[in-house]
Amino acid sequence: MSTAVINADDDHMEPTLQSILDQRSLRWIFVGGKGGVGKTTTSCSLAIQLAKVRRSVLLISTDPAHNLSDAFSQKFGKEARLIDGFDNLSAMEIDPNGSIQDLLAGQGENEGAGDMGGVGGMMQDLAFAIPGIDEAMSFAEVLKQVKSLSYETIIFDTAPTGHTLRFLQFPSVLEKALAKVSQLSSQYGPLLNGFLGSNGTLPNGQNLNEMMEKLETLRATISEVNTQFKDERLTTFVCVCIPEFLSLYETERMIQELASYGIDTHSIVVNQLLFPKPGSDCEQCTARRKMQKKYLDQIEELYDEFNVVKMPLLVEEVRGKEKLEKFSEMLVKPFVPPQ
């Protein structure tokens, strides 16, 4: 089921993410869940803890909302950049739609889809007609870049649940894309040759041969990384949720789908927990805590083989390096409610 590191004499899973820090072989860590449950705060905090015990860590946001810049109060882009105050923790934010646009729209920076010739436009239409191709290309480009940068551990702050799970199918998506393009080029080869110059150039200056070579390179990279994703020594997925029905439902669906893809998951972070003091006269707090406890009990019963980390609801936003560092401590040292 999982490779969580626990002592043989333990009769339960530790309620922390310490096992992830201890598992030195891990290279890819995904943090995902329903929107608004604290994925970004959790992924940033986990990255901070990992940076203490790893040579180099890269945090990548694949969520179009791009909250990393907000979390660290520092602007990030599509190039990896060191986070202020760290010498071994970098971050980057990628546009899920950007990579395929770059690949298909020609070489010039100002060349958009509107400048493309008929065949180039047809290629773009074909590419976008394949479900999930935008995310697939985006991740392929990132993975290619990550490979050349040789970070010890890479953490993905993923888009909300549906997008995350769709991304995990991207190796087969790209395989299908390449098959379709190859089929078209064989079917319409003579026709395409009429449009192309002697060096394979389309009317808009695009080079079809170069584009096909680039796709093939990406496919090889994706195939290699896909094998790593299914290796529990190298990859794990951290589920983030809050103690409410919809979030619990999404988490269960996600864990089942991760299992079907062969991707390891053995950690759940439950955010926004209320801990009213005994005898508190706050009726709303007590009522909400009762509801939360019902779902928290279900989580602990359903996932008794998981590291379930309980994180408190805080009185202020977790933004900036200092607050994130403080929050991150609770991922490795269980929170003790004030008595």
Curated annotation (Swiss-Prot):
User: Mind telling me what this protein is named?
Assistant: ATPase get3
Q: Where is the active site?
A: 63
Q: Name one GO molecular function term.
A: metal ion binding
Subunit architecture: Homodimer.
Record keyword Nucleotide-binding present: yes
Entry keywords, A to Z: ATP-binding, Cytoplasm, Endoplasmic reticulum, Hydrolase, Metal-binding, Nucleotide-binding, Transport, Zinc
* A single BP term in Gene Ontology: response to heat
Q: What is its EC number?
A: 3.6.-.-
* Compartment(s): Cytoplasm; Endoplasmic reticulum
Quote the cellular component terms of the Gene Ontology held in the record: GET complex
Task: Specify which residues bind Zn(2+) according to the UniProt entry for this protein.
Answer: 282, 285
Q: Does the keyword Zinc apply?
A: yes
User: Could you tell me which species this protein originates from?
Assistant: Neurospora crassa (strain ATCC 24698 / 74-OR23-1A / CBS 708.71 / DSM 1257 / FGSC 987)
Q: Which gene encodes it?
A: get3
What PANTHER family does UniProt report for this protein, alphabetically?
ARSENICAL PUMP-DRIVING ATPASE ARSENITE-TRANSLOCATING ATPASE (PTHR10803), ATPASE GET3 (PTHR10803:SF3)
Entry's family note: Belongs to the arsA ATPase family.
Q: Which CDD domains match?
A: ArsA
Please describe what this protein does: ATPase required for the post-translational delivery of tail-anchored (TA) proteins to the endoplasmic reticulum. Recognizes and selectively binds the transmembrane domain of TA proteins in the cytosol. This complex then targets to the endoplasmic reticulum by membrane-bound receptors, where the tail-anchored protein is released for insertion. This process is regulated by ATP binding and hydrolysis. ATP binding drives the homodimer towards the closed dimer state, facilitating recognition of newly synthesized TA membrane proteins. ATP hydrolysis is required for insertion.
UniProt binding sites for ATP: 34-41, 244, 271
